[in-house]
Swiss-Prot record:
The gene is pptr-1. It comes from Caenorhabditis elegans. InterPro entries: ARM-like, ARM-type_fold, PP2A_B56. SUPFAM superfamilies: ARM repeat (SSF48371). Part of a complex consisting of a common heterodimeric core enzyme, composed of catalytic subunit let-92 and constant regulatory subunit paa-1, that associates with a variety of regulatory subunits which confer distinct properties to the holoenzyme. Interacts with akt-1 but not akt-2. Interacts with sgk-1. Interacts with P granule components meg-1, meg-3 and meg-4. Belongs to the phosphatase 2A regulatory subunit B56 family. It is found in: Cytoplasm. This is Serine/threonine-protein phosphatase 2A regulatory subunit pptr-1. Residues 1-28, 500-542 are annotated as: Disordered. Expressed in pharynx, vulva and spermatheca. PANTHER family: SERINE/THREONINE PROTEIN PHOSPHATASE 2A PP2A REGULATORY SUBUNIT B (PTHR10257), WIDERBORST, ISOFORM H (PTHR10257:SF5).
Length: 542
């Protein structure tokens, strides 16, 4: 509401006397002469908590006209045909009056007259051929604007979680629903002429309409979605403006506010718009995908609109398969690191894309894609691992993997083999065995080679660990029993395997002499030669 059309009535507000005890005074009783200082001690001591509902109630969001009394007009169907347009306009003017629904018993008769008039207008526009004449266009648009355009209230719950909390519903919905229904029937009528409507439905009107998508009421957002889609379809001159402003709203949501209620509904509209893009795609549309759509994967409330977002991304790839590498690059960039539920959503979207990907594009993304999948199947969170392993249940994806098994198997095998021995969840272990069995059937020779290589690498890794432990034990022994004064630590003091370990792990590292017993740090150090030829000294681990 813009301002208030009514005033509060009742007894004049009495200012209470200053508090002389309580939190403002540290619990001490104050003398009368000290009262004047209470405000300075606690300037908010007189402020009483006011509920959010009361504050919204008092600060009107509509231009409510409580003084206007509506009069019951004649029925349109009982009026002569030549008099009907004038009566329709009169009823539309009558419906411009907005009532206060926060007071459920106020102006009940007028509210009922308006409700009946709206229902009658809906029936008239829907069932009467030629009902929409040029003279009623401004009256319809003005009535709609008066009813729906308003300042949306702040959320009653500052910690509102759309996934957990119930949304705040619009109290004036009994009238608002009928206004939206009337406007929708008006736009969808075969008698509607866009050439006349564009005089009244302009950029300013659309801008206000888009702002309403932040409404918490899902019923209103659903109507707005349909209305905006009809406007986009009928007014060609507004299409670029609508797309541009939606872009701006998304960018503000991602990079500034992180809060907007209508993302899902706007993405539904965009999904339909993208589906109608002509080929080849314009550069403007490709930029929209990369700069606007894909960053929508970042916000933490992704689950509220992920299905619609994934649909839009898939639509783009179906239109132009060459966009596939860019899409996967962005998905991997925004891949969640600490939120398992988001990771499951990302995996679902990847599978949707792989369902429609072309083999040539698949080959371009094998390395980054399957390295990420290897991380996912290794996840200790069983839902993430399970969702990644379900890719091997998809016949089309399986055929793509089979055609490129020589590239996929070396990436996936180490993770799968390790999980089959170590994962805590037996369901995951069973799924991994199925995948390994599939790999063995695809390319048995490569499978045997990978198995042998992996086992050999594991043995070498265990040996390196043993050598490392022995090395540090020798270091500790040298520290406890330093060599005689003047005697240097040479490689001959080390077992042959430890010398090999030094050469293997750091070919540029050579032992330094241990400090003499006469002073200095007795801990041995090593010198490491850098690529530039300079040397740095690093104390050995104790």
């Amino acid at each position: 509401m813009h301002g208030s059309g009514h005033s509060l009535t009742g007894a004049p507000h009495q200012i209470p006397p200053p508090r002389t005890q309580g939190a403002a005074t540290g619990g001490q009783q104050l003398s009368a002469t000290a009262n004047q200082f209470v405000d300075k001690i606690d300037p908010f001591h007189n402020k009483r908590g006011t509920s959010r509902r009361l504050r919204i109630n008092n600060s009107s969001r509509y231009n409510v006209d409580s003084a206007q009394e509506l009069v019951q007009l004649a029925l349109i169907k009982d009026t002569a045909a030549n008099e009907q347009p004038a009566l329709v306009i009169e009823k539309l003017v009558q419906c411009q009056h907005v009532f206060d629904f926060y007071d459920p018993v106020a102006q009940l008769k007028c509210k009922e007259i308006k409700r009946a008039a709206l229902n009658e207008l809906i029936d008239h526009i829907t069932s009467t051929k030629g009902a929409i004449v040029e003279t009623i266009y401004p009256a319809v648009i003005k009535m709609v604007a008066k009813n729906i355009f308003r300042v949306l209230p702040p959320s009653e719950n500052c910690e509102f979680d759309p996934e957990e909390d119930e949304p705040t519903l619009e109290v004036s919905w009994p009238h608002l629903q009928l206004v939206y229904e009337l406007f929708l029937r008006f736009l969808e009528s075969p008698d509607f002429q866009a050439s006349i409507g564009k005089k009244y439905i302009d950029q300013r009107f659309v801008l206000k309409l888009l702002d309403l998508f932040d409404s918490e009421d899902p019923r209103e957002r659903d109507f707005l979605k349909t209305v905006l889609h009809r406007i986009y379809g009928k007014f060609l001159g507004l299409r670029a403006f609508i797309r541009k402003h939606i872009n701006n709203m998304f960018l503000r949501f991602v990079y500034e506010t992180d809060s907007f209620n209508g993302v899902g509904e706007l993405l539904e509209i965009l999904g339909s718009i993208i589906n109608g893009f002509a080929l080849p795609l314009k550069q403007e549309h490709k930029v929209f995908l990369v700069k606007v759509l894909l960053p929508l994967h970042k916000p933490k409330c992704l689950s509220l609109y992920h299905a619609q977002l994934a649909y839009c991304v898939v639509q783009f790839i179906e239109k132009d398969s060459s966009l596939t590498p860019q899409v996967f690059e962005a998905l991997l960039k925004f891949w969640p690191r600490t939120c398992s539920s988001k990771e499951v959503m990302f995996l679902g979207e990847v599978e949707e894309i792989l369902d429609i990907i072309e083999p040539e594009q698949f080959k371009k993304i094998i390395d980054p894609l399957f390295r990420q999948l290897a991380k996912c199947v290794s996840s200790p969170h069983f839902q993430v691992a399970e969702r990644a392993l379900y890719f091997w249940n998809n016949e089309y994806i399986l055929s793509l993997i089979e055609d490129t098994s020589s590239l996929v198997m070396p990436i996936m095998f180490p993770a799968l083999y390790r999980i089959s021995k170590e994962h805590w969840n037996q369901t995951i272990v069973a799924l991994v065995y199925n995948v390994l069995k599939t790999f063995m059937e695809m390319n048995g020779k490569l499978f045997d080679e990978l198995t042998s290589t992996y086992k050999g690498e594991r043995l070498r890794e265990k040996q390196r660990e043993k050598d490392r432990d022995a090395f540090w034990k020798k270091m500790e022994a040298l520290e406890l029993n330093p060599p005689a004064e003047g005697k240097e630590v040479t490689p001959s003091l080390f077992p042959e395997k430890l010398t090999d370990y030094l050469k293997k792990d750091g070919p540029n590292m050579t032992p330094l002499p241990v400090a003499t017993a006469g002073g200095g740090d007795k801990s041995p150090s090593v010198v490491k030669k850098s690529s530039t030829g300079s040397e740095t000294t690093t104390p050995a681990k104790k």
